[in-house]
């Protein structure tokens, strides 16, 4: 398998500029038919899925995820042919009879419950299995710990972890992300030093940037989406239009 990947890459028709991803692709099926890919947001998990897909471009590939946004993301990122996308709910439904593929790829595995994963494995017929996700991201609504504990009993030859982030090269941000991810007790220091954390006051309602992003922890409460939206809308001079129980103005922020 590794020799086949090397030969494919040496032809020069397809390039992988990340040594980390190149090594993962070269080795993931060298000793196993199952590959588990772990990585935090921004480390290129979707990009690696695309690399795998292009190597197996002539094989039939099935891509599954728990949510429609995750499925749509794979559909946008994967450029290879012979592909089919579906949500897990649709795949395991009784109506679905399309269950055979050469390569089965499941994304955002941390959101997939143990029960649904078992149903997928029982229903699908495949030669190679690729499981992708981040155990620190959103958990399954129903009980689902299989992706977290799988690396404790699956062969190390089948486990690959992407660690290099691509969304920023800012060392201060990378330090904050790493400490948050690892629940490091020293998280406060870099947040204060780099001014990523400030005391909330009335200044948050003042327009400071043309391209502002507002993140709210919930819908209700003083700093919830609903209240923040009302404050910002009241300062918007545009004409208000009522639609149902809501008021909308041109120029309203999207929260």
PLM ranges: what are they?
Residues 63, 131, 214-216:
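Structural beta-sheet core signal
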Residues 111-113, 138-139:
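Catalytic P-loop NTPase motifs of RecA-like helicase/translocase cores
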Residues 115-127:
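Short, conserved "post-DEAD/DEAH" coupling segment immediately C-terminal to helicase motif II
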Residues 55-62:
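Post-Walker A helix-loop "phosphate-sensing" segment adjacent to the P-loop in P-loop NTPases
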Residues 107-108, 133:
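Walker B catalytic acidic pair
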Residues 62-103:
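Inter-Walker segment of RecA-like/P-loop motor cores
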Residues 2-12, 19-36, 41-48, 54-55, ...:
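Conserved helicase motor core of P-loop NTPases
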Residues 101-103, 126-130:
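Loop/turn-to-beta-strand initiation segments
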């Amino acid at each position: 398998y590794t020799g086949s990947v090397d030969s494919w890459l040496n032809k020069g028709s397809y390039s992988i500029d990340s040594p980390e991803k190149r090594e993962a692709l070269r080795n993931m099926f060298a000793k196993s038919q199952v590959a588990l890919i772990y990585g935090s947001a921004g480390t290129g998990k979707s990009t690696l899925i695309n690399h795998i897909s292009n190597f197996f471009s002539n094989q039939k590939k099935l891509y599954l995820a728990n949510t429609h946004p995750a499925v749509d993301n794979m559909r946008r990122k994967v450029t290879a042919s012979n592909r089919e996308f579906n949500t897990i709910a649709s795949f395991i439904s009784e109506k679905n009879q399309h269950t055979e593929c050469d390569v089965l790829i499941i994304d955002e595995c941390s959101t997939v419950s143990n029960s649904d994963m078992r149903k997928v494995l029982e229903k699908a017929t495949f030669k190679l299995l690729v499981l992708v996700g981040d155990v620190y991201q959103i958990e399954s609504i129903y009980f689902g710990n299989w992706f977290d504990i799988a690396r404790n009993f699956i062969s190390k030859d089948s486990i690959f972890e992407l660690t290099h982030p691509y969304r920023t090269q800012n060392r201060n941000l990378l330090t904050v992300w790493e400490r948050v991810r690892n629940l490091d007790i020293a998280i406060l220091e870099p947040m204060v030093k780099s001014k990523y954390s400030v005391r909330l006051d009335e200044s948050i309602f003042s327009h400071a940037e043309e391209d502002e992003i507002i993140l709210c922890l919930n819908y209700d409460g003083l700093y919830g989406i609903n209240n923040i939206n009302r404050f910002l809308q009241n300062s918007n001079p545009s004409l208000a239009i009522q639609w149902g129980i809501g008021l909308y103005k041109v120029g309203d922020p999207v929260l």
